[in-house]
Amino acid sequence: MSSGLIGKKVGMTSVFDDEGNNVACTVVEAGPNVVTQVKSEGRDGYSAVQLGFDNVKEKNVTQAMLGHFEKAGCPPKRMLSEFRDFGDDVDLGDVVRVQDLFQEDERIDVVGVSKGKGFQGVVKRHGFSGVGMMTHGQSDRQRHPGSIGASADPSRVFKGVRMAGQTGGERTKIQNLRVVRILADQNAILIHGSVPGPKSEYVELHKK
């Protein structure tokens, strides 16, 4: 069986646990996924299983990809992703459902693309404190980065100095999130806390 699933973030909600605590959860539409390709060590150089999720119209898919999906016997999929760790019982065209892979109270990793926040300064982007308090004399540089390097020596700015720039929109992994509930009839999984990305963002759910 595959070591993960492709899902789509639906939104957030809250549920009550057995002790009456209100638990904030993210609802993810997890599958069903279809095995669109099985890679082997001998043929491809590494072992992996490729899963497809979310149907797409044939007119929006290239001829090469249409042939790829025909081999698996499934309609074209919008999202494809590979998972490396899996068992030997996976065949081309198999359907993988959320209840086949995950259990409640299990810990999983979630990978997605974080929300893009545009061009941001160092305070928001890196958590800088600014250059000092106004009571110490400065009056117009509260959110500035301060010095970015020395002067004559080395006469340049070192690589990796944290500055303002494009924030968010990066592939991000959140680890050790707890599975609160599995709704098999709705192909949904409730995950404790938040996961990367906006609503309708595709995410990968990885087993630990």
Swiss-Prot record:
This is Large ribosomal subunit protein uL3. One of the primary rRNA binding proteins, it binds directly near the 3'-end of the 23S rRNA, where it nucleates assembly of the 50S subunit. Gene3D superfamilies: 3.30.160.810, Translation factors. It holds the Pfam family Ribosomal_L3. One of its GO terms (biological process) is translation. Keywords: Ribonucleoprotein, Ribosomal protein, RNA-binding, rRNA-binding. SUPFAM superfamilies: Translation proteins. InterPro entries: Ribosomal_uL3, Ribosomal_uL3_bac/org-type, Ribosomal_uL3_CS, Transl_B-barrel_sf. GO terms for molecular function: rRNA binding; structural constituent of ribosome.
